[in-house]
Amino acid sequence: MSEVNVPLSFSDAAAKRVKALIAEEENPSLMLRVYITGGGCSGFQYGFTFDETVNEGDTKIENSGVILVVDPMSLQYLIGGVVDYTEGLEGSRFFVNNPNATTTCGCGASFSV
């Protein structure tokens, strides 16, 4: 497990929403895990899930008492990015503002490098 300063940010809006969701689940040991999988219309897609486990090699990023966890394979595609949260006419969602993405699909759920 790594707790070094990494070039990946966890926005205040995302941390606030994660904190609210954790309170709803009544499980303070939950962390938000962001990961990359193959798929989507652009080759890779982002995934978000709650996790209670920090695996060997994972990187932890903290904001306002909330922890974001990223596995080493996913982190290489997220360097310089920002994990954020938005609410709007299209609904609410977590997303990644990723400077490494050379193309993204229209909804922003998948990307290529």
Swiss-Prot record:
It comes from the Bacteria. Iron-sulfur cluster binds at C41, C105, C107. Its cofactor is iron-sulfur cluster. Pfam families: Fe-S_biosyn. GO terms for biological process: iron-sulfur cluster assembly. Binds 1 iron-sulfur cluster per subunit. Keywords: Iron, Iron-sulfur, Metal-binding. InterPro entries: FeS_biogenesis (IPR000361), FeS_cluster_insertion (IPR016092), FeS_cluster_insertion_CS (IPR017870), FeS_cluster_insertion_RrpA (IPR023063), HesB-like_dom_sf (IPR035903). The keyword Zinc-finger does not apply. One of its GO terms (molecular function) is 4 iron, 4 sulfur cluster binding. One of its GO terms (cellular component) is cytosol. Required for insertion of 4Fe-4S clusters for at least IspG. Homodimer. Belongs to the HesB/IscA family. This is Iron-sulfur cluster insertion protein ErpA. It comes from Vibrio cholerae serotype O1 (strain ATCC 39315 / El Tor Inaba N16961).
